[in-house]
Amino acid sequence: MSIDQSTAAKVAKLARIKVEEDALPALAEEFNTILGFIEQLNEVDVEGVEPMTSVTPQRLKRREDVVTDGNQQDKVLANAPDAREGFFAVPKVVE
């Protein structure tokens, strides 16, 4: 796949990036370089390789998925400029 100057201009417009007319050839060439690298990645044989999220194996502690209130209400409301009856109090914004 090859990116021409008009496609590069369209991509720049969609990304809301202002690109001068004389910079379009360089931008198109950069896009082509990136696409070439992606095509190289597509040629890599990954058959039998398990997907991973990190290069180092990680095991997370498992816990029961239970809903709690966190027992932090007093600490959280201590930061509020105005709290009433266990809730944040805010000024009325709708008439």
Swiss-Prot record:
One function term, GO molecular function aspect: glutaminyl-tRNA synthase (glutamine-hydrolyzing) activity
UniProt KW Protein biosynthesis keyword: yes
Catalysis: reaction(s): L-glutamyl-tRNA(Gln) + L-glutamine + ATP + H2O = L-glutaminyl-tRNA(Gln) + L-glutamate + ADP + phosphate + H(+); L-aspartyl-tRNA(Asn) + L-glutamine + ATP + H2O = L-asparaginyl-tRNA(Asn) + L-glutamate + ADP + phosphate + 2 H(+)
Domain of life: Bacteria
Enzyme Commission number(s) from the entry: 6.3.5.-
Keywords: ATP-binding, Ligase, Nucleotide-binding, Protein biosynthesis
Free-text function comment from the UniProt entry: Allows the formation of correctly charged Asn-tRNA(Asn) or Gln-tRNA(Gln) through the transamidation of misacylated Asp-tRNA(Asn) or Glu-tRNA(Gln) in organisms which lack either or both of asparaginyl-tRNA or glutaminyl-tRNA synthetases. The reaction takes place in the presence of glutamine and ATP through an activated phospho-Asp-tRNA(Asn) or phospho-Glu-tRNA(Gln).
Family: Belongs to the GatC family.
PANTHER family noted in UniProt: GLUTAMYL-TRNA(GLN) AMIDOTRANSFERASE SUBUNIT C, MITOCHONDRIAL
Record's protein name: Aspartyl/glutamyl-tRNA(Asn/Gln) amidotransferase subunit C
